[in-house]
């Protein structure tokens, strides 16, 4: 068998059309969703990500602000900038582009962002809400994975999902979202002994470790769904994921490519979260006016 390719770019475009309608509805009420991105230093990859976010905002008719800060900025100065954005009513989402310089604590910066404007879904309050099944801003990559599976009509209830990776950004929250959707979840990581023993049992494998060829055809069972979150370069300098795509696609039922797989979904869900924040802000304004 040859797997069906899950085209993240096409699914992201379909989701963006829905978001565009929501932005239009808000703009008719003279309310424009606003996203502020803080970029510290001049990391080239970070600059590319930020440009993509700015373009997505512009394409959807959203307001975006880019705040560039030097790499020698102090942690206190960065927190002051975040505080200003927390108070700014025209901004509904705040994102500090990671990674940060070594002298700045990512944990402290994430916690400085108001949970109501934490559209990355990294704040401990949003993580706690997600874990307890409450309404929350969901981390964008795991959120995008769930939306992709929904779009192809794949129901994860009762399925065994193996997450390879345990980062706070992808691995851990992805497992939680699958658990919330009634899947049985197993986590594997760098200290897992005999990775294939676990992944071969999986109906769904999510590879999120940042190391190419982590998942080969020997790691999956026939007909598994394979989601590749990795972003690496091969020997020719071409983008590739954590999955040995060419061999795994002949055994899987569905597989995401790299690029044009999970990547486009991440920024799309960031836009979705920002619009959701704006909708909540408008509701709060209406409630305040009534009272």
Report each predicted region and the residues it spans:
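Anion-binding alpha/beta catalytic cores of soluble intermediary-metabolism enzymes, centered on
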Residues: 96-156
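Glycine-rich phosphate/diphosphate-binding loop of Rossmann-like nucleotide-binding domains
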Residues: 42-54, 136-225, 238-246
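Positively charged, low-complexity intrinsically disordered leader regions
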Residues: 1-31
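C-terminal helix-to-coil terminal segments
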Residues: 2-6, 10-11, 264-291
